[in-house]
Design a protein with these regions (language model features):
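Active-site beta-strand-loop-beta-strand hairpin of nuclease catalytic cores
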Residues: 28-30, 165-170
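Core dinuclear metal-dependent hydrolase active-site scaffold
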Residues: 2-5, 20-25, 137-165
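Metallo-beta-lactamase
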Residues: 57-60, 65-71, 75, 102-149, ...
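Cap/insert and terminal regions of metallo-dependent hydrolase folds
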Residues: 52-62, 167-241
Length: 241
């Protein structure tokens, strides 16, 4: 099993990444974890926040990153969406041949929510051509790949554990624990994002992931939006195994 980490976009003021992940299994499956942000959505977000802070660029687009690894869109067997915010599902429709995995509670929440964040991305994920497996809670969804529902950042968000032989267990925390500062005991984790929908659930989600780190013997935590630790991770074409 191999885990590739790559950058789909960057938040320029802090150097915080918008990452994507590819897992190549021992039986030659290609599993994508989140599908990134489109240039159009980045422009729309920049308009909303009134600044040109989110930068994408052609080289960072998921299809181009995968192409440099020799992988075409039709070679992606499965996609795990941690959630449906703009930087996690932008290219879902590019992988319509894949099986998609998302928490049932999140899928239903996104469909019914009035949250503008889902209105921005609905065209990417609410497509009858996409085949979703709706997951209920923590479970192994593919050999060596498990999801952990936290509900922190938004209802039904899930983190992903990838079991690697050399590296050990890797936790892709997603936005449930988006930066390393949220691990500290003397901070309020909910202070770190305007997109968090329930501060108390953020705190509960972080506490759950802290327990998971110990109970699942996590050897590496990858934080989604932390420019301070991003340079320390291996990036594609390098990989963890």
């Amino acid at each position: 099993m191999k885990l590739y980490v790559f950058e789909n976009a960057v938040y320029k003021p802090k150097g915080d990444p918008f990452p994507g992940f590819l897992v190549q299994s021992d039986n030659n499956m290609n599993i994508l974890i989140d599908t990134g942000v489109t240039p159009e959505d980045a422009r729309r977000l920049n308009e909303i926040i009134g600044a040109n802070d989110v930068e994408v660029g052609e080289a960072r687009l998921p299809l181009n990153v995968l192409g440099r690894l020799g992988i075409a869109p039709q070679n992606i067997n499965a996609v795990i969406n941690t959630h449906f915010h703009y930087d996690h599902c932008g290219f879902n429709r590019s992988f319509s041949q894949a099986e998609f995995y998302v928490q049932k509670s999140h899928y239903e929440y996104a469909l019914s929510s009035k949250d503008e964040a889902f209105g921005l991305t609905e065209r990417h994920w609410d497509d009858p051509a996409l085949r979703y497996h709706l997951i209920d809670g923590d479970q192994e969804i593919l050999p060596g790949i498990r999801v952990v529902r936290t509900d922190g950042h938004v209802r039904g968000i899930q983190s992903v554990i990838v079991e690697l032989k050399k590296t050990g267990n890797v936790l892709i925390a997603s936005d449930a624990m988006r930066n390393s500062r949220m691990l500290a005991d003397n901070v309020n984790p909910a202070q770190y994002s305007m997109f968090d929908t329930d501060p108390e659930m953020v705190n509960q989600g972080v506490q759950k992931l802290k327990r998971v780190i110990v109970e699942q013997n996590i050897q590496l935590v990858i934080f989604n939006h932390d420019g301070s630790v991003w340079p320390t991770y291996k990036k594609a074409p390098d990989f963890y195994d």
